[in-house]
Amino acid sequence: MIKQRTLKRIVQATGVGLHTGKKVTLTMRPAPANTGVIYRRTDLNPPVDFPADAKSVRDTMLCTCLVNEHDVRISTVEHLNAALAGLGIDNIVIDVDAPEIPIMDGSASPFVYLLLDAGIEELNCAKKFVRIKQSVRVEDGDKWAEMKPFNGFSLDFTIDFNHPAIDAGNQRYRLDFSADAFVRQISRARTFGFMRDIEYLQSRGLCLGGSMDCAIVVDDYRVLNEDGLRFEDEFVRHKMLDAIGDLFMCGHNIIGAFSAFKSGHALNNKLLQAVLANQEAWEYVTFEDEAEMPLAFKAPSIVLA
């Protein structure tokens, strides 16, 4: 049986909030089978839980938020959610003593290291996947995102930025997903932004934690970070990272083929909701025998070592 995963032990880290610029303590805890992914704000009394749920997602200019029925929100969940998807973690409680998850270095890599440091525990309960049965496509102007049946998990993402720092040949990225591929090829890709946008937001008291420590920053001509890029195509790889996190908001790894052109958090979420709303388009599946499971989700050495 392919089993659900959680952490072996509690792990904690501190970072800076992108919005407030203040220190945030992040604590990730093991959870029993069928708990799902739960984000929890412990700065509120009583603490407020935000289960990962496609319908609770709100896209702001700066990040992805989860918002409950009382309009309470937790912000900047997308990169941690991508790390959970990448390592196939089904059950976890994530505490923060702030309104947001810390931004860390702007990628999913610090979260991957924390999760691997905590260790991955298999639970004696079958892991549920969402298997795509019919193609579903959403559009917004010239932007689109699509999910098709496929026995695995593949991603094909194209961006379209007319900017001297972003080479025209580095605007498409394809990935046959596995935990190893995610960690090595996707998790280290950082978010990016324009210096003028960051300066404008900070002048309005927003994005106070934004800096070159947690993003690729560009002006009209070049990348301003002293160390440059981690990959030639880091921009499109980060957009794929975002999509992996966005699609995991259903709480389950997806068996299907995702492709997108100029998509972002809002359109990715619109696609996920469109899939889930069409009961003919998907089904839950479990695997009694590992040999039946798509190679994409086989537990790699780095995860269960």
Swiss-Prot record:
The keyword Mitochondrion does not apply. Its EC number is 3.5.1.108. One of its GO terms (cellular component) is membrane. It is an enzyme of class 3 (hydrolase). InterPro entries: Ribosomal_Su5_D2-typ_SF (IPR020568), UDP-acyl_GlcNac_deAcase (IPR004463), UDP-acyl_GlcNac_deAcase_C (IPR011334), UDP-acyl_N-AcGlcN_deAcase_N (IPR015870). The active site is at 265 (proton donor). Zn(2+) binds at residues 79, 238, 242. Transmembrane segments: none annotated. Its cofactor is Zn(2+). Pfam families: LpxC (PF03331). GO terms for biological process: lipid A biosynthetic process. GO terms for molecular function: metal ion binding; UDP-3-O-acyl-N-acetylglucosamine deacetylase activity. Pathway: Glycolipid biosynthesis; lipid IV(A) biosynthesis; lipid IV(A) from (3R)-3-hydroxytetradecanoyl-[acyl-carrier-protein] and UDP-N-acetyl-alpha-D-glucosamine: step 2/6. Keywords: Hydrolase, Lipid A biosynthesis, Lipid biosynthesis, Lipid metabolism, Metal-binding, Zinc. It catalyses: a UDP-3-O-[(3R)-3-hydroxyacyl]-N-acetyl-alpha-D-glucosamine + H2O = a UDP-3-O-[(3R)-3-hydroxyacyl]-alpha-D-glucosamine + acetate. Belongs to the LpxC family. Catalyzes the hydrolysis of UDP-3-O-myristoyl-N-acetylglucosamine to form UDP-3-O-myristoylglucosamine and acetate, the committed step in lipid A biosynthesis. This is UDP-3-O-acyl-N-acetylglucosamine deacetylase. The lineage of its organism: Bacteria, Pseudomonadati, Pseudomonadota, Gammaproteobacteria, Enterobacterales.
